[in-house]
Amino acid sequence: MNDYRPLTSEEIEVLKSNDCWAEDWTSVNVAEDFKPNFMHRVMLYGEVNIGAFNKNVEVSQGFVKHAGINNATLRNVTIGDDCLIENVGNYVNNYTIGDDCYISNRSTLETTEGATYGEGNRVSVLNEVGEGNVILFSDLNSQLAAFMVKHFSDKELKEKIRQLIKTDIDNKMPERGQIGNNVKIVNTKEITNCIINDFCEVNGAARLSDCTLLGSAHGNVYIGTGVIAENSIIAEGASVINSVKIQDCYVGEACQLSNGFTASTSVFFANSYMSNGEACAAFCGPFTASHHKSSLLIGGMFSFYNAGSATNFSNHAYKMGPMHWGILERGSKTASGAYLLMPATLGSFSVCFGKLMHHPNTRNLPFAYLIADGDKMFLIPGRNITTVGLYRDIKKWPKRDLRAQENRKSIVNFDWLSPFSVGEILKGKKILESLREVTGDNVSQYLYHEYIIPASSLHKGIKYYDIALRIYMGAVLKRVLKRDPAITPPATQVGTSDWDDLSGLLLPVSEEERIVNDLKEGNIESIQQLIERFEEIDTNYRQYQWAWTYKMICDYYGIPEITLEDANRIHEDYIKARRSWIAEIKKDAEKEFAMGDVEEEVFRNFVNSLNQEVDYEN
């Protein structure tokens, strides 16, 4: 911003001749090289500071106008250099506007008493009628939000986190609304109590109230036609367009909300895509997608998730209120018309078909199909391991990360086989083997928590789980051998026990517990330090993964340590398992091609990509 000086008497006369008026000309200050001839029909109230008008401003591709202020009412406003502000139907009141901005054909831009800009807003996700388990603020990421939700019942920890966030917000809170540099706001009705950072564009929005748009040179924010946003924060690279309505929401980096989607008290992180449908009290972690008008995401925690059309969740038992919730772990899907009765927990990479009752808990049976057939509920464990859909998903997600390197606040680990998911597979394999042992082999079906597992599906589930285990062990060992041919045992015990998925961050539970203790003991003194702890864990992921996997390999093969001879055996098992996996996926693709409506070129290209998998064996 400039150092401003008082107007000269000559400048005042020029302004008056251009039909400008001021409540008090002595309260109007300007930049040193200010040119009054670029202001027309402007009314000035209170303290107003105005920059220079030296450049042209591009208002549309190939169409430029000179910077200036025309047809506007300003009160208590500071304006940077080379802005074009024109046709303000109502007024601009209590705002600071940066350099190189274009503001045109809008009604009101105002900061009122008590403005929060969406910062510090407490929202209740999962439990729709809860007390507010996530605090919205500019530095929020998926890990911190998931951490808050998970530990909300720990009052001491909750209070520590709230105090750190309050301090962070207080240190950054401006005295009035701000518009950054290179911002474009056109054809928009009302903006009240908002911070709009650099390189944002608001085009045709209906109303923005108590919001922060976190644009930057590396990721601009775009707000489009008909959008209403209240008490919300929208992060770098996000777009909210085509009559979307959001209230009490956080929209994370590179998220896209479009086509009349509506959401309240929900959070969306890292490349999530929402169109047409609705969300309420939803925790949408990285790569959550819903495309259909008839889909409702309510009371659920999701990540790497795809909602089929007419997906619905029931969070209300019509007794104590809409307080029930569920978790669909990473990679889950719901088919068209799927319905899930909360509370429920689905293991990683599960797929739901039909109206699923009995509050399923399949965390320890991941990669499952859950199928409702009338009143009967079926569970097909491990089925999703060998599908075309899974193969395409795990290949596409890394390619679809649209975030700039500078704007990756949420940590996203793309490993589909990790100590977290493989830990579930190990438990699932034991569950299936135990069911077979207890019930015997001479039965047509098994029962697991009121879900029917057909006998053939149980046997295949054990087989598919074992394929996944061998693929995982071989892949990790192959990576270790490249940097350490001697296969040195892990230098740490961190990671050898249970793991968790904190909305994209795969981490040992022990490290999460260490963060909890450090927060309570005051060893983490700022939000930035807390975020850095999550980043440190992610940096050490391969080290912790090796500690867990080394122990797992020894347990699986019944060996005290891994020798080079063992490594050769594990690699052979890896190649066999991987080829079996690819063969099963190829069968799945052939079944779909046989339906008759898949173009042969598409099928052949997919099969060719499978055939190339042999290149990654060594």
Predicted regions and their residues:
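Long, compositionally biased intrinsically disordered regions
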Residues: D373-N618
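Core alpha-helical transmembrane segments of integral membrane proteins
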Residues: I179, V183, N187-V202, D210-V221, ...
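Phosphate-/polyanion-interacting regions in eukaryotic proteins
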Residues: G68-E159, V186, E521-I524, E532, ...
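Glycine-rich hexapeptide-repeat left-handed beta-helix
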Residues: P6-E10, V14-D24, V30-F53, V57-I69, ...
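A charged, amphipathic alpha-helical module
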Residues: Q163-G180, I185
